[in-house]
Amino acid sequence: MKKKAMALTVAAMMAAAMITGCGQTAAPTVETAADTTVQTEESTADTESTAADTAAADGESYTIGISQFAEHGSLDNCRTGFLEGLKEAGIEEGVNLTVLFDNAQADTATASMISDNYVSQKVDLICAIATPSAMSAYNSCLDSDIPVIYTAVSDPVSAGLAKEDKTPEGNITGTADTLPVEAQLKMIREVLPDATKIGILYTTSEANSLSTIETYKELADDYGFEIVESGINTLADVDMAAADLAAKVDCISNLTDNTVVQGLQTVLAKASAAGIPVFGSEVEQVKNGCLAAEGIDYVALGKQTGAMAAKVLKGEAEASDMPYEACEGANLYINTEVASDLGITFPENYEADAAEVFETVTVE
């Protein structure tokens, strides 16, 4: 029996008919919140175009909806990778693929409106980026045969999207961005040998954050840490919560919490004022001013998701039969400018071992 991952709010249901801002046309690509231009390596571009041209010549074409919960680097990278994964499978935007894209701007009611709209337009597939959008898409598609492929969902089981054995709770599957918490704790201990308290800021309504914090708590003692958490409800809460948390801990470890990531510059400012570092959870956060991260490559995760979606679109597999997949391994990212500003010296092997070293802070 299908079950709802999250009850739709009354406001979302009343507003579903008002989603004129998400209205799409027959153009090959419709963008209402962000640019979905995808860049691929020149060495593979010709092969991918040929595959898509062949599919188009055979009369195969698809329309998909991409619902992204918030606008920040990791989710943008997921979307880029997702379209690259489809392209590598011969499904190319503007050739045999129409993409309807909408960004919920970190609002769950808007996410529900977006997925409801895609269902009314009878798209061939919905790609949901981040846990709240995935839960909304799942609910919207309960009474339809539209498959949902999600990405950047940290814990599909706690979100009600999958069973413990990774099999789907309906016509929905995708990829999980479960954070490498143990690798992160090990790295923090190496960088801050005298630290005892790690602060974590999270949104109380994000299931992915709640489950990740539990993992932190389970493992923290093994590395001599105490986890100090602070919950927020909206982006407006970040300023006060970050300042209060920074005064109590030796460092902050950032999650992939969508609301907190949107307020990352505020978190960084409060931490800097307190003289403590912020550790990120993926490459964009380190680029934007976090000290370091054992994190995930979200472009690669998106490509993995795109490959799964291509199988569903081509009729090679049913989403309801595909266990969700997880991103394997972690990459080390460091920012030497941040380290210098804080008077922190990385272990001598870090620059050589890092997947990427940022020498400056770049905020886009």
Language-model segments: which ranges?
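Extracytoplasmic "Venus flytrap"
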Residues: Y62-A89, L100-A109, S205-S209, T259-V260
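Beta-alpha junction/loop-to-helix N-cap segments that form part of ligand/metal-binding clefts
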Residues: L100-K163, D257-S272, I276-F279
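Hydrophobic alpha-helical segments within soluble ligand-binding/sensing domains
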Residues: A56-D58, D155-K197, I296-A317
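Bacterial lipoprotein signal-peptidase II cleavage site
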Residues: A5, M18-A34, V38, E42-A45
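An alpha-beta-alpha
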Residues: I64, F82, T173-A220, M322-A339
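Hinge/cleft segment of the Venus flytrap/periplasmic-binding protein
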Residues: K311-E364
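Pocket-lining segment of extracytoplasmic ligand-binding domains
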Residues: A207-E282
